[in-house]
Amino acid sequence: MMVIRPVERTDVSALMQLASKTGGGLTSLPANEATLSARIERAIKTWQGELPKSEQGYVFVLEDSETGTVAGICAIEVAVGLNDPWYNYRVGTLVHASKELNVYNALPTLFLSNDHTGSSELCTLFLDPDWRKEGNGYLLSKSRFMFMAAFRDKFNDKVVAEMRGVIDEHGYSPFWQSLGKRFFSMDFSRADFLCGTGQKAFIAELMPKHPIYTHFLSQEAQDVIGQVHPQTAPARAVLEKEGFRYRNYIDIFDGGPTLECDIDRVRAIRKSRLVEVAEGQPAQGEFPACLVANENYHHFRVVLVRTDPATERLILTAAQLDALKCHAGDRVRLVRLCAEEKTA
């Protein structure tokens, strides 16, 4: 059974293996053991209540409960940009016009922005390619909403997600090549690694501070503004179906889109509810997949179960109860895994 649980110190080697499979561009999962160990420690201290909000971050892993294999990782940053500035480009417009010459030009322009400062962030989503099946990707991504719904007071009103931009298998980023490299004088992979290992001072020191007309970029770079890496397209679709939208903010390195949503408008958060569990044989039938999570802050668990999402009493097997660290009579959080398709 696939189970979402909080990260543990013993997961570091498994996270190193996952990091080696990302192909670059996932800034928050560098193949650097010291950085990953520090990330785990920060997550543990967050759960223990030892960190200020500006440093808090939760990390979860997807584990096969039978073999102990760690198949994926996902995380939530509680409030971004309160220690180090949080940069985006806002894609806006500057108008240049002259009535006398009968000229009017509306030019797409990149403005350096810190507008998302203080937002909660969904980040570090990666599923081992060998495990991209049977709803694992949905479970990994959406499990975070169950945690946010259960412990709403831990998070801010807006939640954002930076999506991986267009980068090829050799680490070539058209956006970086046309813009970032001119100011940072390094390859994309180097800048990405520095950022992922916490060495972010260079961003503030070297970032262009003035608006940038996108027409000055190569056509290839212009074409990838706000676009996602092909492997990230499914993750973007998942978030958009939960209510997230692209509001013209992009990543300063690869030009990938930043999606955002008011936390209380996220479908899985808004529609999740508490039901009582009992032990037994679940009813047979064509039921949809549902997320089921316990309400245990320190021992949080999420699994996928096929059941009636409208039930008031959830029947689970002994194995499912054990995976959830629950007992009969406990209350668990339940929501349909995917939004119901609207019928005409």
From Swiss-Prot:
Active site: residue positions: 229 (proton donor)
Listed GO MF terms: arginine N-succinyltransferase activity
Pathway noted in the entry: Amino-acid degradation; L-arginine degradation via AST pathway; L-glutamate and succinate from L-arginine: step 1/5
UniProt keyword list: Acyltransferase, Arginine metabolism, Transferase
UniProt-listed Enzyme Commission number(s): 2.3.1.109
Enzyme class at the top of the EC tree: transferase
Keyword hit for Transferase: yes
InterPro entries from the UniProt entry: Acyl_CoA_acyltransferase, Arg_succinylTrfase_AstA/AruG, Arginine_N-succinylTrfase
List of residues binding succinyl-CoA: 125
Gene Ontology biological process: arginine catabolic process to glutamate; arginine catabolic process to succinate
Catalytic activity: succinyl-CoA + L-arginine = N(2)-succinyl-L-arginine + CoA + H(+)
The organism's place on the tree of life at top rank: Bacteria
Function: Catalyzes the transfer of succinyl-CoA to arginine to produce N(2)-succinylarginine.
Stated family: Belongs to the arginine N-succinyltransferase family.
HAMAP family: AstA
The name this protein goes by in its record: Arginine N-succinyltransferase
Organism: Escherichia fergusonii (strain ATCC 35469 / DSM 13698 / CCUG 18766 / IAM 14443 / JCM 21226 / LMG 7866 / NBRC 102419 / NCTC 12128 / CDC 0568-73)
